Amino acid sequence: MDSGCGTVKYQTLLTPTIAAMPETEIDLRTHHTRLLEGMARCVAAQGYADTTIADIVREAGVSRRTFYEYFTDKPGCLIALHEAASQNALAVLRSAINPDRGWEQQVEQAIAAYLGALALNPVLMRALFVDILGLGLPGLVARRRANQQLADFMREVVNQQPSGPVLLHKAMAMAVVGGINELVLQAIEQDRVAQLADLVAPASALLRAVVTAQSAVPGFEEK
């Protein structure tokens, strides 16, 4: 399919089976997925600000009417893409860890995979980290929800012993996620997305330091 958005490299949201289906066999859910894929390709190629609804529907191979069956506007589509990408990121994190290793190694593996996935496309990454915040409260809510999912995953890995102590509480996990996000945002601002792998060591060290500090505080309890 010809498109003004070009061919870009990013982690797909479509399964190969769905991507190969003819238009007549595509159900409503797949139309939604195609629109998200179209949005992702266009944003990755030309940025969010320069992407139009016409670009999205052309890339998705659907009508403008179909777009408005799912989204009220372009910001709504970006929020949906952000949520889908967040779920994809969680899948990347889960598939990266080796359950036979300790939590320190598991988390480091997950962080490396996460940052590696982000670095695949700097423009799309900027939209999901920066442009989403320009959408006001709905964008902030979507970002907060994604951060909470990452924090929950982090706690799941660190606190994996059912009968063991709680090594990482909720507030501290969110603080670590916030710190990692700030490192990523700094890399975006400084045009160092290609070097995101350099953040694996400090991000992992931050988590270890927080866990160590939390265990050293007498009477520290979940709030």
Where are these regions (language model features)?
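Generic hydrophobic, amphipathic alpha-helix propensity
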Residues: 28-39, 56, 81-89, 93
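Helix-turn-helix
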Residues: 34, 42-76, 80
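Short, structured motif recognition centered on aromatic/hydrophobic residues
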Residues: 89, 127-128, 180
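N-terminal intrinsically disordered/low-complexity leader segments
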Residues: 1-30, 158, 215-223
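Hydrophobic alpha-helical connector segments
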Residues: 80, 94-120
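Amphipathic alpha-helical packing segments from all-alpha helical-bundle domains
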Residues: 137-162, 170-182, 197-205
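Amphipathic C-terminal alpha-helical segment
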Residues: 117, 156, 170-194, 206-220
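Amphipathic alpha-helical segments used for helix-helix packing
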Residues: 118-138, 155, 185
